[in-house]
Amino acid sequence: MNVIILAAGQGKRLTTLTKNKPKCMVNLFGKTLLEWQISVFKKCGISDITIVTGYRHELIDFNGLTFFQNKNFETTNMVESLFCASEKLNKSTIVCYGDIIFEGKVLNCLIQSKSDFSIVVDKQWKKYWEMRFDDPLTDAESLKIDNDGNIISIGQKVQKINEIEGQYIGLMKFQNSGIEKLKQFYEKTKNQSKNKPNPLNPHVSFNQSYMTDFLQGLINEGCKLEAVQIKNGWLELDSIDDYNKYTELFSKKTISEFIDLDV
């Protein structure tokens, strides 16, 4: 099993924290985000780690890891970053956003999933979103799960809280026939977008497709995406407000309401 960390972005919403370094290299609770991630991957037995870099790529330097560069990071999104490392999509592969940290038990839940497509979903998202946002609906996106535990809707803007049965966290796994289906679907939709609107999302170019657009496209193709359900145990660092709130919770020793940093 290997892992691909998507860490090409600058993270402009972190303002001065990312003026001279990439988002994944921001220090949180004494370690950079990448250091938190690499540590938990290794604790869970995964040492084959690839990082897709972009903004200030020269600052991301870890011994024993594999690196690919998304040279077009300013005009592309997560899907294109992933396929910069397409040669690593050759066995069971975990894909992880570069702006999250998570407990080992969250990762182990994903590792243990036997599905071709496994997507980590936080079922206890509401408390976390209420801590981060005055109105959780301004940022939260749709996620619906069928009776078999598979995701049937993901990544859409919502009007009502009952349209959200969990939140996608940016951590997933592809394996077995899922790897080949993933690559085939990418090539198919990329070719379709050359002379017509982007089939994943007509509002953006194919290169700017969101990962949730891509996952919804797989669902629409008939692929079964298992929702690996968790209850907290992770953080996303998306804005300076996030950083300030997490730092305050850490100083008050109440960050454990959302994540156990010792696990």
Residue ranges of model-derived segments:
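Conserved alpha/beta core of the MobA/IspD/sugar-nucleotide pyrophosphorylase nucleotidyltransferase superfamily
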Residues: 1-3, 161-263
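Conserved core of the sugar-phosphate nucleotidyltransferase
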Residues: 104-185, 189
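Conserved beta-loop-beta/alpha segment of the NTase-like Rossmann-fold superfamily
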Residues: 60-140
